[in-house]
């Protein structure tokens, strides 16, 4: 058995050059106490049947469900609507959107402006990394979203709010994402509970409080 950066390499791992070369943080994940090398092999399932049986999980205030919680590389989510979020999510990795039912709008910050990107049923959209984005989902919409697991990678997520009147940034949180189903809620509550954070430094407009998070 040989070593790589002080970590023993079994013949099994030496047979995986594509994985070792592709992911620069592979060894960090292998040696992490919180990660296993490979998740258990799961059998295929009928996605539409799963959606039909779990629609109650895809409603506010959470609206999303991670399908493979043991996966080490990808978060594979089903996301439902409606939502009424005004925040923008900031991800240092790319995000893949595939719209299964209905049409949604992803508002992005592009060249200092809020720009709407419509994703119709059956359409796919790859959002580049580091683009603030706010998915706006109507009632009876279902979408698939795939993004990178953050744990074991030097990545931080962000939540941002921009003024409704002049698009000036109101506030921003940066944090390591551990659980995509629960980690946003405390930041939502902190922002909406503070009139100071919701007040624009540029035009003095105050964003309305969202009673769901207070």
Regions found by a protein language model. Give the residues of each.
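His/acidic/aromatic-lined binding-pocket segments of jelly-roll/cupin-type domains
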Residues: 76, 87-90, 94-99, 116-117, ...
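Short, conserved beta-strand element in jelly-roll/cupin
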Residues: 90-109, 143-146
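Cys/His-clustered metal-coordination modules, chiefly Zn-binding fingers
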Residues: 148-214
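A short, N-terminal "cap"/entry segment at the start of jelly-roll beta-barrel domains
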Residues: 23-80, 85-87, 186-214
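Conserved metal-binding segment of the jelly-roll/cupin
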Residues: 79, 119-139, 147-148
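Low-acidity, Ser/Thr- and Arg-rich intrinsically disordered low-complexity segments
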Residues: 10, 14, 29-32
């Amino acid at each position: 058995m040989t070593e790589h950066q002080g970590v023993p390499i079994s013949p099994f791992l030496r047979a995986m050059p594509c994985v070792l070369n592709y992911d620069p943080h592979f060894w960090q994940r292998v040696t992490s106490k919180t990660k296993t090398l490979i998740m258990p092999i799961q059998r295929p399932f009928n996605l539409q049947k799963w959606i039909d049986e779990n629609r109650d999980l895809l409603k506010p205030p959470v609206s999303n469900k991670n399908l493979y919680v043991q996966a080490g590389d990808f978060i594979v989510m089903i996301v439902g609507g409606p939502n009424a979020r005004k925040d923008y999510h900031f991800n240092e990795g790319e995000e893949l959107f595939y719209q299964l039912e209905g049409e949604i709008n992803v508002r992005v910050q592009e060249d200092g402006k809020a720009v709407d990107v419509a994703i119709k049923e059956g359409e796919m959209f790859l959002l580049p990394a580091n683009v603030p984005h706010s998915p706006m989902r109507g009632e009876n919409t279902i979408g698939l979203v795939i993004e990178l697991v953050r744990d074991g990678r030097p990545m931080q997520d962000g939540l941002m709010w921009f003024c409704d009147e002049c698009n000036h940034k109101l506030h921003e949180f940066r944090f390591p994402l551990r659980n995509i189903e629960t980690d946003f809620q405390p930041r939502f509550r902190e922002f909406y509970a503070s009139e100071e954070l919701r007040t624009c430094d540029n035009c003095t407009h105050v964003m309305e409080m969202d009673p769901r998070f207070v």
